[in-house]
Every structure is written in C-alpha cells, then in structure tokens.
C-alpha cells in the first residue's frame, strides 16, 4: 500500500491514495491552518472507525444478521506532551437492524477488535482501547440498550 502526501500551503496537505482518492488535511486557524479538512490525527481515528465498521457490517451480513445501519462514535484522549499519542480510545457502536441479537453484535465487534481490524489492533499496541455498543430496532429512534464489552 502506498500513499502520497503533498504540501498545499501553510499547514494544509493533500493525501493521495494508491486507489486514486484524495483527502485534504489542515490545521486549526490558531495553528496556521484554514480548517480546510480534518487534522491528521483525526484521520487516524476516521480510518480506524471505517476499518472496524466495515468489519462489523461484513461479519453480521456474512452471518445473515438483519443489519440495516452501523455507526461508530470514537472518543480519544490525547497525551498532553509530545508526541501527543492516544493513550485511551473508546469505540461506541450503534448497530441497527430488524431483530438483531445482542450476542451477534457483540461477537462481530469482538472479532473486529481482536482479529480483523488492522488499524485498531495497531493502535491497541500503544493505547488502552475500550468498546461498548447499542442495538437498535430498525424504524425506531429510541436507544434500546447500551452494552459494555468485557
């Protein structure tokens, strides 16, 4: 896998992927940026969220679970001093479907976290990662239950 990062101006860069996609990254105005895109460390979390969401949906579909939506909300803490790594990251999954079982969702999240999601497994080498999830019935906007994975 290869990517190319090109400086645009000030603290703005464009990242180009081998698959032909581009993404602008920029800093906050107080850091010399113009807020043209996410910060580079935000893209780490976005990529990790995409990786694990992909896995969870794929695993549920492969098991013929009636999943209709999957959202991952990630909260990460930055270290106060350089390098400002993520010492703690929390993944909150909101998985929606018709008659989804808690056990199906928990298993899919566990497999992603422990076996398939390269990004979260790499981050887990330096950060304490926790997960929890909600299962929602399709057609309802009510939070059903929040489950913690142990």
Task: Report residues per predicted region.
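Extended beta-strand/beta-hairpin segments
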Residues: 1-46, 57-150
